[in-house]
């Protein structure tokens, strides 16, 4: 359980990881959220960069016990407005939540976020990749299809990988298919 007790070691581990990214802690006073970076004065959430607000909100959801075994987290493009150097840390935290019984759904168009799940997951992690794409029916109309794989690289309809490959080809002037 992620949040068992006020000072559970598991919760502390999450909060410590998130504190490395946000460089502060989250406080709530009179239903207003604040980020307190180190020894600086607290900042209202609306004055904090969007990426830090996301991290601070995740911090608060863990701190208050919302994200515990059986909970579901939906996160649309967690990489948006986040410094790319923190992507591996975010993936580690999401994998930890999954290990603790939180069901995590993310959507992304980011190669690095998707690939870090492949790199950092272990055999016991329940990570699945889904690709939604349009395909022509026999009638000539397009339909939405879905493909599922246990690894990012195994998706056949993978526009993220196709775009990354195209960039690489453009950069070195060679075609890889």
Task: Identify the meaning behind each predicted range.
Residues 76-78:
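Walker B catalytic acidic pair
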Residues 89-91:
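Conserved hydrophobic alpha-helix in the ABC-type ATPase nucleotide-binding domain
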Residues 94, 98-99:
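Conserved ATPase "switch" residues in P-loop NTPase domains
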Residues 69-72, 101-105:
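Loop/turn-to-beta-strand initiation segments
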Residues 1-70, 135-177:
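Phosphate-coordinating catalytic segments in nucleotide- and nucleic-acid-processing enzymes
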Residues 107-109:
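H-loop/switch region of ABC-family ATPase nucleotide-binding domains
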Residues 117-140:
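A short helix-turn-beta junction within AAA+ P-loop NTPase domains corresponding to the substrate/partner-engaging
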């Amino acid at each position: 359980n992620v949040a068992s007790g006020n000072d559970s070691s598991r919760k502390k581990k999450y909060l410590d990881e998130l504190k490395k990214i946000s460089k502060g802690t989250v406080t709530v006073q009179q239903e207003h959220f604040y980020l307190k970076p180190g020894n600086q004065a607290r900042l209202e959430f609306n004055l904090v960069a969007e990426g830090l607000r996301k991290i601070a909100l995740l911090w608060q959801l863990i701190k208050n016990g919302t994200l515990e075994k059986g909970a579901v987290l939906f996160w649309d493009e967690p990489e948006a407005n986040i410094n790319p150097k923190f992507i591996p840390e975010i993936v580690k935290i999401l994998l930890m939540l999954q290990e603790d019984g939180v069901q995590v759904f993310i959507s992304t168009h980011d190669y690095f976020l998707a690939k870090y799940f492949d790199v950092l997951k272990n055999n016991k992690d329940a990570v699945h990749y889904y690709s939604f794409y349009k395909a022509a029916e026999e009638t000539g109309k397009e339909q939405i299809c879905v493909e599922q794989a246990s690894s990012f690289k195994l998706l056949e309809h993978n526009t993220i990988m196709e775009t990354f490959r195209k960039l690489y080809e453009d950069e070195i002037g060679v075609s890889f298919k």
